[in-house]
Amino acid sequence: MSAAKEQLLAAQETQMTLIEKDSTDLKDHIDSWGPVRREHGLLYAARHKGLIWLGLNPVPPCSVKCLEARQAIEMQLLGNSLKESPWCNEPWSLCDLSWGRYQAPPAETLKKGARLVEVEYDGSSTNKTWYTAWNSLYLRKPDEEGWETATGGADADGLFYTTMSGTRVYYELFERDAARYSTTGTWTVRDNDRTYHSHSAPSHSRETIEGLWNSGGRERGRPTNSPDRAVLHTPPGGNTVHGPVRACENRGRSINRPTPYSTPQSPRSGVGPDTTSPLPSPVPQNPRCVSLPDGFGRGEEDNPPSPDQHDVIPNPQPKEPRFSLFGSSGGLPCLLISGTGNQVKCYSFRVKRWHRDKYHHCTTTWWAVGEQGSERPGDATVIVTFKDQSQRSMFLQQVPLPPGMSAHGVTMTVDF
């Protein structure tokens, strides 16, 4: 299995090099999926032979590696196909050709230029949610080889993209979420500097929403001059793609969603009732609840202080001592652990997780600075510090060093 370990290490090292390159060239991202596929294939073969570890890497079940290997193959073939299209020379980031973005709504499309679309229900500033819209989308042509581009947008109905032929395809409908989280069936959409208001309150008794479907799982859109009827998008698996995750699905309780940015608390003109105005309260039935003049029949015991009236001061946490390589007057015992970038990063992760009590501090992975660009001459290195010589000796005895790595003991002293 030594050959398999070397091949796995080489595949992981190639992946790290391409990730740190931060390239915008499509060819580099196509090449990055090759070592990913080899890594999953090696781990699949290792698990098939009954191994649960391959070097320092745990071996997942065969079903997991088989699925991830197929995903890598699909993305590599997708990139090779895109390389033959007119958009091959555009700047492409590693995220643009990632599996997660490829499967994000609308599924099985490449996307660029994400932006947030805010939807406010019932005119309430506390009843909001956000969706992700895309400026540009790239789709495989269903009936012929090749690619076509589309522009993303949003309106009062939902999120959509418009193809080169003028067909508008909706992949997210706000009406469905309004039926669950809105009491009046109205909402306001804000997309950058554009604002849209919902149409008349939808009928929630309708069981289905009309749509056009084809056998490939991708919906057929409608021309832009056709009547407003949204097309519901369903991925090939059959499960309807929902919008963002919501923290509460009970409309009887207040809905507080985390905001991706700070919003002013001033009232806005929106559709629906004004939720900021207080509602008239019923006449209390308990005589103790009747408002009395100040100083009449009230004592200090009747009005206990509210927690909101006092500042909560947390107990101060003791500050950890600041890390320094030269903190010890007699010299700080250290170890210089060197190897390839992947080896050193895996090693530092492992000792931090399983042997944290056996050393004092550990630095991040570092290299020497090259003469040009992002060149990194020499091996990757981490510095592990210890409180005294005995702790370092015990660390060397109890923590094994993987093959191919080296450890050098040094003592940090200050000359001036």
Swiss-Prot record:
One of its GO terms (biological process) is DNA-templated transcription. Residues 190-321 are annotated as: Disordered. Its main location: host cell. GO terms for molecular function: DNA binding; DNA-binding transcription factor activity; nucleotide binding. InterPro entries: E2/EBNA1_C_sf, Nucleotide-bd_a/b_plait_sf, Papillomavirus_E2_C, PPV_E2_N, Reg_prot_E2, Regulatory_protein_E2_N, Regulatory_protein_E2_N_1, Regulatory_protein_E2_N_2. It is found in: Host nucleus. Residues 1-203 are annotated as: Transactivation domain. One of its GO terms (cellular component) is host cell nucleus. Coiled coil: none annotated. Residues 333-416 are annotated as: DNA-binding domain. Phosphorylated. Keywords: Activator, DNA replication, DNA-binding, Early protein, Host nucleus, Phosphoprotein, Repressor, Transcription, Transcription regulation. Residues 256-278 have a biased composition (Polar residues). Binds DNA as homodimer. Interacts with protein E1; this interaction greatly increases E1 DNA-binding activity. Interacts with protein L1; this interaction enhances E2-dependent replication and transcription activation. Interacts with protein L2; this interaction inhibits E2 transcriptional activity but not DNA replication function E2. Interacts with protein E7; this interaction inhibits E7 oncogenic activity. Interacts with host TAF1; this interaction modulates E2-dependent transcriptional regulation. Interacts with host BRD4; this interaction mediates E2 transcriptional activation function. Belongs to the papillomaviridae E2 protein family. Plays a role in the initiation of viral DNA replication. A dimer of E2 interacts with a dimer of E1 in order to improve specificity of E1 DNA binding activity. Once the complex recognizes and binds DNA at specific sites, the E2 dimer is removed from DNA. E2 also regulates viral transcription through binding to the E2RE response element (5'-ACCNNNNNNGGT-3') present in multiple copies in the regulatory regions of the viral genome. Activates or represses transcription depending on E2RE's position with regards to proximal promoter elements including the TATA-box. This is Regulatory protein E2. It comes from Odocoileus virginianus papillomavirus 1 (DPV).
